[in-house]
């Protein structure tokens, strides 16, 4: 006799954490990164990240591993060659390009928490926000604002709304959290219900990785 779908084992929740490959100048960044990694593991939530052993990436991954959590890294061949890959993870996946890396991280994760970081972190944040805006993805994106790091970005987004470049409804896709607990709660909740740019409002957004932008 076949078991019903209700009896099948659910897919574990995983959150992707975007953050810097440096630790930054404020000790608060590293402290919050460690707290986030530990909190994810304690809640049984898997960590998906960029696969690096350095900076906030390494701190978050180490904390999650030490707390017994699942940690999956996705890194490019070039970065493996630069010897920055984290080798002590549950699983490390190596992909060809940065685009492949973003696509795979998106595929593995149920939501995104964005810690302080540099250009790469902003690129990842902006792409996931855009995929949600276009209706190609339906996964929450949360800025974990440590020491006011993301305040200039939040101000810019408000200006983009003011000057007509972003719809007010789409501005809601970028959520702000002031604590680790708040960030996890937001990232594991349904994405805000917004109309999808250029697409029919009744269209059902894809849950996986978009085939094209």
Describe the residue ranges of each PLM region.
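Short acidic/polar capping segments at secondary-structure boundaries
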Residues: 118-120, 134, 147-149, 180-181
């Amino acid at each position: 006799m076949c078991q019903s779908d209700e009896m099948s084992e659910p897919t574990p929740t995983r959150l992707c954490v975007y953050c810097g490959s440096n630790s930054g100048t404020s000790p608060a960044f590293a402290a919050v990164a460690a707290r986030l990694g530990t909190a994810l593991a304690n809640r049984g939530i898997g960590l998906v990240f960029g696969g690096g052993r350095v900076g906030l990436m390494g701190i978050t991954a180490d904390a999650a591993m030490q707390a017994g959590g699942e940690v999956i890294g996705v890194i490019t061949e070039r970065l493996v060659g630069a010897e920055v890959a984290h080798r002590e993870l549950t699983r490390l996946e190596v992909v060809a390009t940065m685009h492949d890396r973003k696509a795979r991280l998106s595929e593995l994760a149920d939501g995104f928490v964005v810690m302080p970081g540099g250009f790469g972190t902003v690129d990842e944040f902006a792409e996931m926000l855009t995929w949600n805006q276009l209706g190609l993805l339906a996964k929450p994106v949360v800025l974990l604002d440590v020491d006011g790091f993301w305040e200039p970005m939040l101000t810019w987004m408000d200006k983009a709304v003011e000057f007509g470049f972003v719809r007010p409804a789409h501005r809601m896709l970028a959520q702000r959290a002031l604590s680790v607990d708040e960030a996890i709660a937001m990232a594991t909740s349904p994405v805000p219900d917004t109309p999808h740019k250029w697409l029919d409002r009744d269209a059902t957004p894809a849950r996986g990785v978009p085939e094209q932008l």
